[in-house]
């Protein structure tokens, strides 16, 4: 089973809110996920609000989960990918 770290959209029209989840690559965007890793709120006034459980993200990366481009950018901004590369 190929696992991806990706965003699941929540919120109302023109007011998105996302969960960062580990999901089967074949599942639909807002479909079944395996585990929630964090949240991403791009609508915050000053800057996008990101909350990530670092241990869960590192666990999934170690197990071979591939992040999507957007999640890759979020993880690198938070410094999680640097920690993952240092552990290799």
UniProtKB/Swiss-Prot annotation:
Gene Ontology MF terms in the entry: structural constituent of ribosome
Gene3D superfamilies: 3.30.1320.10
GO cellular component, one term: cytoplasm
InterPro entries: Ribosomal_bS16, Ribosomal_bS16_dom_sf
Any one GO biological process: translation
Annotated TM spans: none
Keywords on record: Ribonucleoprotein, Ribosomal protein
Similarity field: Belongs to the bacterial ribosomal protein bS16 family.
HAMAP family per record: Ribosomal_bS16 (MF_00385)
Name of the molecule in the record: Small ribosomal subunit protein bS16
Organism, scientific name: Staphylococcus saprophyticus subsp. saprophyticus (strain ATCC 15305 / DSM 20229 / NCIMB 8711 / NCTC 7292 / S-41)
Gene: rpsP
């Amino acid at each position: 089973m190929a696992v991806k770290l990706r965003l699941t959209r929540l919120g109302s029209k023109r007011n998105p809110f996302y969960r960062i989840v580990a999901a089967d690559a074949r599942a639909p965007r807002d479909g079944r996920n395996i585990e929630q890793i964090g949240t991403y709120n791009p609508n915050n006034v000053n800057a996008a609000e990101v909350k990530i459980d670092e241990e869960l993200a590192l666990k999934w990366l170690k197990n071979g989960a591939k992040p999507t481009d957007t999640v890759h950018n979020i993880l690198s901004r938070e410094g999680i990918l640097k920690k993952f590369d240092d552990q290799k």
